[in-house]
Amino acid sequence: MRRLFALILVICLSFSFAPPAKALGADLTPCAENPAFQALAKNARNTTADPQSGQKRFERYSQALCGPEGYPHLIVDGRLDRAGDFLIPSILFLYIAGWIGWVGRAYLQAIKKDSDTEQKEIQLDLGIALPIIATGFAWPAAAVKELLSGELTAKDSEITVSPR
C-alpha cells in the first residue's frame, strides 16, 4: 500500500508542475524610446546645486530598460551585457564587506594578547588597527592561505557537540 501511494504521489507531482516561465524582461523597452519615461524626463527635478542634475540623471537612466510605467528596472539575471547594472556593484560590495570583516577579525585576534582587551574593543587602538586596515585589501589571498594552512578553520576536537 505504501509503495502504491508513493507511486501515485510521484506521478501526480511530476505531471502537476509547470515549467517556469521566463519573461526575461519581455515588457521592458529602452528608456530612451519609452514614452512614459520621456514624459517623466520633461519634469525632471534637480537634486543637487547643479541646475542640470535632473537632466543628467535622466540621460544616464535612458541607457537602462524601462517598464510600461516609465521607471528604469535593474536586470539581475546574470546576463553579461548588463553587468554594470548589478553584477559589478554586487561583487564590489562583497569585496568591501569581506575587507571589513577580515580586518575586524584580525584586529580582535591582535588585541587578544593584551590585558585590556575589552577596552580596546570599545576604543580602537589605532597603532594596531591602521597597519591591519592597510593590509586588508589582500583579504581574499590571505583567506585562501589561512584556509589551506588550517588557521582559518577550527579542528574537529575543538568543536563542542551538544549531548542531545
Swiss-Prot record:
Gene Ontology cellular-component terms listed: photosystem I reaction center; plasma membrane-derived thylakoid membrane
Compartment list: Cellular thylakoid membrane
Signal peptide start-end: 1-23
UniProt superkingdom: Bacteria
The protein's role, per its UniProt record: Probably participates in efficiency of electron transfer from plastocyanin to P700 (or cytochrome c553 in algae and cyanobacteria). This plastocyanin-docking protein contributes to the specific association of plastocyanin to PSI.
Similarity comment: Belongs to the PsaF family.
Subunit and interaction comment: The cyanobacterial PSI reaction center is composed of one copy each of PsaA,B,C,D,E,F,I,J,K,L,M and X, and forms dimeric and tetrameric complexes.
Name of this protein: Photosystem I reaction center subunit III
Gene expressing this chain: psaF
